[in-house]
């Protein structure tokens, strides 16, 4: 429990206590060698882990401590960003680790690599260009280049929450990996048409948006997030929708693989208000909610 003082309406000190959760849970060290990911043996098992995962019955603890000041917005030195995000990943692990274990899965703390803008990074999944942030299932690590801000709207690229939101989304993919959802997706998509595979991928991405919202909700008090942060988080998620990116960067009007701005925002907000992770079950949602 943390006790601190605030001011009431009469500008008088008022003691407020916060009973943080998961305080006794032992945070695993950062690792570049996590346990292997679970992988379903057939389509029946794959459907079970995507559509009816044991994780969906679990609630994330809240509030969870995160003694970490947010960045002030915009680009910072790569070393500063790397230190901030690795500490933030520790907070996310304190949120997600007990939930994974409750559902019967193994928790770990992934490593973040911040690579220079304009350059490439070599990962277990191959080589990737900058203006990107991603989770690599082959090495179970997270990667980000600061010039990912260049693809965002000027309305949100200076928000102090932007890097934390992006990493919460990518950490959501790490949770999908550890819970077998990613493995299930890979099994299921092998026999799908192109349009069906795109929809399956959008289900996966919007679930990561929802997981990001749920985790940030758990960390809300610990990070001292505000109503303005909430507005920025919601707007940023909308701005990275397939349709919004296409319009802003004059890209061809094609079917996207991440979801429209409206649907990405929908699932983020569901995560922010989730009582259980079943609220993030995009795999059984109507197609219209994952367009």
Positions of predicted regions on the chain:
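N-terminal low-structure segments adjacent to metalloprotease catalytic domains
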Residues: 1-60
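Acidic helix-start/capping segments at beta-turn-to-alpha-helix junctions
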Residues: 73-81, 85-91, 101-124, 232
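Active-site recognition of the HExxH zinc-binding catalytic motif
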Residues: 96, 161-181, 208-209, 213
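Catalytic zinc-binding patch centered on the HExxH motif and its immediate surroundings
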Residues: 117-145
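Short pre-active-site segment immediately N-terminal to the catalytic Zn-binding motif
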Residues: 148-166, 196-200
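Post-HEXXH active-site segment of zinc metalloproteases
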Residues: 179-202
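Post-HExxH zinc-binding segment in Zn-dependent metallohydrolases
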Residues: 194-220
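Pan-zinc metallopeptidase signature
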Residues: 244-291
């Amino acid at each position: 429990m943390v006790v601190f003082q605030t001011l009431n309406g009469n500008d008088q000190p008022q003691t407020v206590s916060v009973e943080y959760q998961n305080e006794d849970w032992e945070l695993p060290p950062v690792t570049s060698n996590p346990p292997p990911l679970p992988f379903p043996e057939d389509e029946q098992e794959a459907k079970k882990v995507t559509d009816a995962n044991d994780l969906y019955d679990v609630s994330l603890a809240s509030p969870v401590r995160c003694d970490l000041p947010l960045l002030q917005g915009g680009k910072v030195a790569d070393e500063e960003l790397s230190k901030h995000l690795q500490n933030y990943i520790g907070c996310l692990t304190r949120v997600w680790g007990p939930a994974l274990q409750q559902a019967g899965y193994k928790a770990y703390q992934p490593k973040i690599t911040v690579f220079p803008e304009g350059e490439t990074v070599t990962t277990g999944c191959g080589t990737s260009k900058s203006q990107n942030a991603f989770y690599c299932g082959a090495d179970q690590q997270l990667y980000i280049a600061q010039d990912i801000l260049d693809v965002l709207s000027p309305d949100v690229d200076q928000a102090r929450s932007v890097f934390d939101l992006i990493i919460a989304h990518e950490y959501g993919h790490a949770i999908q990996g550890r819970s077998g959802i990613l493995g299930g997706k890979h099994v299921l998509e092998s026999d799908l048409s192109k349009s069906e595979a795109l929809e399956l991928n959008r289900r996966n991405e919007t679930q990561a948006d929802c997981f990001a919202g749920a985790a940030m909700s758990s960390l809300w008090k610990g990070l001292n997030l505000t109503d303005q942060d909430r507005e920025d988080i919601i707007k940023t998620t909308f701005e990275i929708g397939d349709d919004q990116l296409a319009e802003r960067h004059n890209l061809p009007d094609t079917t996207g693989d991440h979801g429209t701005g409206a649907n990405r925002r929908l699932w983020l907000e569901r995560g922010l208000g989730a009582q259980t992770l079943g609220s993030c079950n995009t795999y059984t949602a109507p197609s219209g909610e994952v367009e």
